[in-house]
Amino acid sequence: MSSVKVAVRVRPFNSREIARESKCIIEMAGNTTCITNPKVPPGSSESVKRFNYDYSYWSHDPRDLEFSTQAMVYSDIGEEMLQHSFDGYNVCIFAYGQTGAGKSYTMMGKQEDGQEGVIPMICKDLFRRIQETESDDLKYSVEVSYMEIYCERVRDLLNPKNKGNLKVREHPLLGPYVEDLSKLAVTSYQDIHDLIDEGNKARTVAATNMNETSSRSHAVFTIFFTQKRQDRMTSLETEKVSKISLVDLAGSERADSTGAKGTRLKEGANINKSLTTLGKVISALAEIASKNKKSKKADFIPYRDSVLTWLLRENLGGNSKTAMIAAISPADINYDETLSTLRYADRAKQIVCKAVVNEDANAKLIRELKEEIQKLRELLKAEGIEVQEGEDGEKKIHSPNRNRKRTGSSTEMAVDQLQASEKLIAELNETWEEKLKRTEQIRVQREAVFAEMGVAVKEDGITVGVFSPKKSPHLVNLNEDPTLSECLLYYIKDGLTRLGTSEANVPQDIQLSGSHILKEHCVFENKDGVVTLVPHKDALVYVNGRKVIEPEVLQTGSRVILGRNHVFRFTHPEQAREKREKNKEVDVCETPGNSGEIADWNFAQCELLEKQGIDLKAEMEKRLLALEEQYKREKRAADQEFEEQRKTYEARIDALQKQVEEQSMTMSMYSSYSPEDFHQEEDIFVNPLFESCWTAREAGLAAWAFRKWRYHQFTSLRDDLWGNAIFLKEANAISVELKKKVQFQFTLLTDTLYSPLPPELTPAPAVGALTNGGQEDEFGQNPIPRTTVAVEVTDTKNGATHYWSLEKLRQRLELMREMYHNEAELSPTSPDYNVESLTGGDPFYDRFPWFRMVGRSFVYLSNLLYPVPLVHKVAIVNERGDVRGYLRVAVQPVMDEENADFSNGVKQSARILFDEEQNGQHKVPKIRTIPDKDEKYIEGGNEMGTKLEELEQEDADSGRGDSSVASELHESNDQEPGEHLQPGKEFTFRVTVLQATGIAAEYADIFCQFNFLHRHEEAFSTEPVKNSGSGAPLGFYHVQNITVPVTKSFIEYLKTQPIVFKVFGHYQHHPLHKDAKQDCQITRPPPRRMLPPSIPISQPVRSPKFGPLPCPPSSTVLAKHDVLVWFEICELAPNGEYVPAVVDHSDDLPCRGLFLLHQGIQRRIRITIVHEPTPEVKWKDIRELVVGRIRNQPEPADDEDSDSCVLSLGLFPGEVLEVPGDDRSFFRFEAAWDSSLHNSALLNRVTQTGEQIYITLSAYLELDNCARPAIITKDLSMIIYGRDARTGPRSLKHLFSGQYRNPEANRLSGVYELSLRRASEAGSPGVQRRQRRVLDTSSTYVRGEENLHGWRPRGDSLIFDHQWELEKLTRLEEVGRVRHLLLLRERLGMDTTPNPTTKTEKDVCNLAQRASASPVHMVIPPSPQTPVKDQQAPAMPERELSVRETELVWKCVKLIQGRIGCKELGAEGNGSGTQASDASPGDEGCADMNASYISSNSIELCSPERVDMPNGWEAPAPAPQTQDLSLRLYVPELEEIRVSPVVARKGYLNVLEHGGSGWKKRWVTVRRPYVFIFRSDKDPVERAVLNLATAQVECSEDQAAMVKVPNTFSVVTKHRGYLLQTLGDKEVHDWLYAINPLLAGQIR
């Protein structure tokens, strides 16, 4: 084993470094190389770094005595490596360093004597030693190959047939090798010299055509050296084979130092990939060598990451003697690159190679290859494939299964491996004479190719290398890389010499290729020794930097540039000789000789830029001046802005100071009052300073508003969740690290009847909010319990669940931290703490009871007032509103004659006192039949605009169908109690717990406990009953007699309050295994209209340009508009156009669809906005389109800050479209969407089966007269298929319907409501208060967070989930109360009313029931032109309604409306009174819609069957709107409307629009409150939307007679009118009922 020999060589300064006056930072002393950091002060510890290598060559200054020449480098490294090759070892020498560091000079050198590099010198010395030592017993053979690695592609430089890229294979015996790479036999150094020259020519041609240079490619020159020695004594022939690999690496590129851009930047990236991989390999090998002992697991070395390291695998740490020459620059401007090179070289010293003598390699290799070929033939024969040898030696493969489309992958691999092995064995069996013959053939082919290209050749046919003709004019190539310059020479013969490409119709004498070279580019005319260049039309030809269009006479030394990359120097030997002899002082033809500059490639390029008007220095100075001016301008703007801000802050400070002074003056006035003054009648609130003249109605409204404000608490709950999330994360992290089986998560708890809070979780009331002992506030109302944030502790070890307050969490967290710090002091033999976990000593655990709460039930006692017995079947409900079973309870009064009978099943008796003082101390919250809207503690459950009178009306009429029952029973309850409830007497009643049913089998030992709400300490309990789980009822049959002295408080309790029943059971199974299953089996699903949509309406994606979204304004809504938006995702088609991707509308849901995309294709997102024309809404342009929230589930993540996939798309300007025949406003814009920039695997890969991808896009649009951008947000779902996959649906439904043939069907619709609010500078105080910023600590890092595997504390979504639970509890409570009242009413015989229900009441009730099935209820008031009385007259005669009937009719009307009526109907009113207006606040600014039609003298309407319409007819149109077009600033709000999935009616209608050309048959779908118009029933895209909430519907016989079209009715919106005709007479009423149920009922 031997280490890699490492040498470092420093070159002289180049012209660039001299021009920049660089300083030398390299010093060498012996084998030590020192580098000085120019950025660090001299003398510091980090200023100088020292490295020791095997050799350090000082080649900086030739005048130095220690200057190292090429010969010295070769004598130290080359001779040693050559000796190793004669010994039979593999040898490798490679040069490493940055671009321009001198690698190519060290390896190749120059043609002058003494300037040869390592490669020519080692080849020359090789053949010298061969000639000296060759004899009859010792024979030598040498073969060479020359390849180039560019951008991970391998090219053969010696064989012109191998024009393409060669494959790199790996053989188990040979290792990595290049397939079909030419290995040419050579017999002398001159042969190698010529092959190197030929290879450089091929490299030059390819580099010129591809615009490359050698510094961007790796060159590998390999010599295969074979020694055959004949042993005369044994007559045995031994063979040694060594491989000499000479590598010239590409320079390491730095984009900022080389100025690389575009393609050059990509080339540099590929070069750096190879060099980076080489560095990784060197580091890995050095690390392995530095280890003391070999690791058990083999270390991974990334050889395969690049072609270069793969081919050099044996030379790096393998079977090779390797030397590395690190070339460095001495300049300080290259400090970073030089230091990196030195570090790589230092690491390479540690690499250990295991070189062995390659003796008798061929014999062993041939034998093993033959065995491998035989095995492969047997394998193919077993597969039914025979390999036969043809007449020409070619292997022919015969397979009986040719008709199969494809064979197995194993068979194909075997055939491929067989062919590769046979190529190798044929190459090894080739004799030396055959190799020489093949080499000569390749040389002839190569010369022919060069001659065909026009490269000059000698008389013997050999191409010209470094040779200058004496007479003939010629062109010599110039290249950016000096090693490739002057390699190619092209003669210009007498007469015409054509130059072009090989594809020209006329054969070209000089053939070039590459960009901007025409088929016939130009012609050189050589006449009488004068060469004229004649360019063809549109050909790029430059002479001495000037573009040539007309014929140009060339002078010797002229620089000729053809196309973009081909640079030549024209030379005329005779002309140059004459000029020199005639006058040497004349500057001929702008040659640069006099100026001392060399006419190389750089000179030609600079000359081109200068002559074409591109002066680099002038451009740089101009750019510097522009930057300086920009800096001054920005500095002035910044200073001005700073001055304005300073003045603003000073003004704000003055205003605050003035405010403080005013407050201090006011408080000084109060200081004159004594404390006794405030306890007298002259209170501060009746002080003249605070006197307010409020009426009783205003005071009541203020009290209602104050109570409503107190019940809103979403913001405080969110603050608690955000502020304590970091504590929750830390507790979970400690729990995981200490291996505690406890998990903590936020939850919300509200003190309700079904979920009472323990005292430690009850939130403290606000200071001053409660009076009278904390029971009632100043308004005489009991406060609704506030919702509190708690921590749900899931103890999976003990199978229990606890709830902690936030304060308890912080206290326990301190103990957890202490336990965590003490954990390190415990030894492995420390005892387990299971005892502490059970006794409560461990801060992670709490004590848990044996029995667990199953649920609660409530039984009302109103039947005891009458007195009658009742048997109740009540639901057992848990804390989350889930029904866990049912309980049967009997409640009956015990009269005097029954008191003595205790033998009939009576188990227990008790006596309870209901005295007034005790009841006052334990007053329970008042339970209403239906809570008032102002007392409903579910935030957001009521309307702000509801009037106080309507709230008072709600107390008497809940609108839910139970008011009549409650009112009748309340009237009875308000009467004097019966004789059995006379105050002072004792009253006994009996509560019998009969049975429990439906309780899950997981609960064992069930028992029931009940008590009065205010007497928790006096509870009655049954005996436990075994729950077998068979489904049979659990019989308790527990009888409890209760005797109570009758008081007013007891009577009040019987009227309003229930008894609570608590059912307990021992939970015998582990909760984590059964809870989830139990929840899924028993939990009732919420009603359909309460469920969240499958794809929720997301909040806008945060824009990088606009920052966080501002708070929504609370100012007045000035106008509302309905907006229809179409979304399309377009993909690049083969014809170059962007075609909309297929959208699958198979789910038949409104505004829903699934985009079917292809992988790896360019896409664009196209959005079209459609709305009615209005002067208020004018789109200016699209400001930004943001795409983010990439996910595979419909709901986005709670934490938006962690979304790293947000991408702002490149925008195209928006445009206003004009659609023929449609006068609506259309605004469309597009954005380029490169989904790979999201760096999301979901968008990069093909979507898995059954999976869908969801994204959220937000478009920020600018409108006229709007202070903020309008934001359109939409969630899109998609599936990504393979690039060539067909995305069209394959179902028979779509096959026969042809739904997807129309490209306009491939779009997704969205319905939005645009609200324009008045812009406010400061906003209301509520807005300012809501703008406070609370830090969300859920994303703050906590030590150990990575162990949580992505777990996050719950956020805002928890509040909405809790709202649904509270809604369920409220409904269960209401249902239980109403069920009790109905049961009591039936028991009392109150169902037989004296006045039976009339037919009118039945019709109205049926109408209300049918209308309530629709999810949205809206009433469209009839037009004054169509009185209701006239339409109702034919249906039934008018009659006077009683008060009772009037109340019933009015309640049904409110049921249809779905909200409270706007105007209370008086007792004397009739059913045909004027209805209240339904206009929203946003509609107040709009003019009333005029539904009247044209006068009777208008032209008749044609029927829908007639095609041509009269020009004079006008459809029903709204009245002209008088808008104030003065400049007003608005704040736009675009909110997506979730369209109801319920279809009220769908079918074909004939539609006539205002201003339309005629009747059109359209498919119409009614999803209240919207009507969608489609082109046909197969059209999945909504083309138009009508909002029934703001429309007016009319249908009358007068209207039909006037338009002379039967079966018609009109729909008039704010902007246009529609006339609709049904296809049949019977459908008119059904359509009217679907659109306007009240109007249909009136006409009926």
From Swiss-Prot:
Q: Which residues form a coiled coil?
A: 358-434, 611-670
GO biological-process terms attached to the record: retrograde neuronal dense core vesicle transport; synaptic vesicle transport; vesicle transport along microtubule; vesicle-mediated transport
> Which stretches make up the PH domain?
1542-1640
According to the lineage, what is the superkingdom? Eukaryota
Major subcellular site? cytoplasm
A Gene Ontology cellular component where this protein is annotated is: axon cytoplasm
Which part of the chain is the Kinesin motor domain?
Answer: 3-351
Q: Where in the cell is it found?
A: Cytoplasm, Cytoskeleton
Q: Which residues form the FHA domain?
A: 497-563
Q: Where is the composition biased (Basic and acidic residues)?
A: 968-983
Q: Which keywords are on file for this protein?
A: ATP-binding, Coiled coil, Cytoplasm, Cytoskeleton, Microtubule, Motor protein, Nucleotide-binding
Q: Do you know which InterPro entries this protein is assigned to?
A: FHA_dom, Kinesin-like, Kinesin-like_KIF1-typ, Kinesin_assoc, Kinesin_motor_CS, Kinesin_motor_dom, Kinesin_motor_dom_sf, P-loop_NTPase
Among the Pfam families in the record, one is: PH
Which parts of the sequence bind ATP? Answer: 97-104
Biased segments, Basic residues type: 398-407
- Residues covered by region (Disordered): 391-412, 952-984
Q: Which GO terms describe its molecular function?
A: ATP binding; ATP hydrolysis activity; microtubule binding; plus-end-directed microtubule motor activity
Protein family according to the UniProt entry: Belongs to the TRAFAC class myosin-kinesin ATPase superfamily. Kinesin family. Unc-104 subfamily.
Function recorded in the entry: Required for presynaptic maturation, has a role in axonal transport of dense-core vesicles carrying synaptic vesicle precursors, components required for the morphological transformation of axonal growth cones to mature boutons.
Self-association and partners:
Monomer.
Write the protein's name. Kinesin-like protein unc-104
